[in-house]
Amino acid sequence: KESAAAKFERQHMDPSPSSASSSNYCNQMMQSRNLTQDRCKPVNTFVHESLADVQAVCFQKNVICKNGQSNCYQSNSAMHITDCRESGNSKYPNCVYKTTQAEKHIIVACEGNPYVPVHFDASV
């Protein structure tokens, strides 16, 4: 079974995107990372930083997660991210996404030993 840490990497890590600037980026990535297998995942964020930099966030500013848990952390610096949001004309299995690039601080939930990101909570 895929570990929570490996699932985070599959769903959210893209350190050196070849085509993040393309409007088709989300359509391609959501499909290739299996985020449209049994439904169209409505919203997903990809982070274009090294895995080490994202894992380091687990030791940065401790914040409360959206669900009320206390194991979320906010990055000290803004990171290059791409937000993928399902567009109105999207219908499974033909999932269609809008691609939006941004520079924002990320908030991730961390757990385990080693202590690593397992959930992308928000960007601010």
Swiss-Prot record:
Biased composition (Basic and acidic residues): 1-13
Keywords associated with the record: Disulfide bond, Endonuclease, Glycoprotein, Hydrolase, Lyase, Nuclease, Secreted
GO cellular component, one term: extracellular region
Catalytic machinery residues: 12, 119
GO terms of molecular function: lyase activity; nucleic acid binding; ribonuclease A activity
Highest taxon of source: Eukaryota
Keyword Disulfide bond: yes
Glycosylated residue positions: 34
Record-listed E.C. numbers: 4.6.1.18
Keyword Endoplasmic reticulum: no
Tissues showing expression: Pancreas.
Cell compartment(s), UniProt: Secreted
Broad class of enzyme this protein falls into: lyase
PROSITE patterns: RNASE_PANCREATIC (PS00127)
Residue pairs linked by disulfide bridges in the UniProt entry: 26-84, 40-95, 58-110, 65-72
Binding-site list for substrate: 7, 10, 41-45, 66, 85
Biological processes, Gene Ontology terms: defense response to Gram-positive bacterium
Annotated stretches, region: Disordered: 1-25
Reaction catalyzed: an [RNA] containing cytidine + H2O = an [RNA]-3'-cytidine-3'-phosphate + a 5'-hydroxy-ribonucleotide-3'-[RNA]; an [RNA] containing uridine + H2O = an [RNA]-3'-uridine-3'-phosphate + a 5'-hydroxy-ribonucleotide-3'-[RNA]
PANTHER family hit by this protein: RIBONUCLEASE, RIBONUCLEASE PANCREATIC
Quaternary structure, from the entry: Monomer. Interacts with and forms tight 1:1 complexes with RNH1. Dimerization of two such complexes may occur. Interaction with RNH1 inhibits this protein.
Sequence similarity: Belongs to the pancreatic ribonuclease family.
Role, per record: Endonuclease that catalyzes the cleavage of RNA on the 3' side of pyrimidine nucleotides. Acts on single-stranded and double-stranded RNA.
Protein name: Ribonuclease pancreatic
Source organism: Capreolus capreolus (European roe deer)
Upper classification of the organism: Eukaryota, Metazoa, Chordata, Craniata, Vertebrata
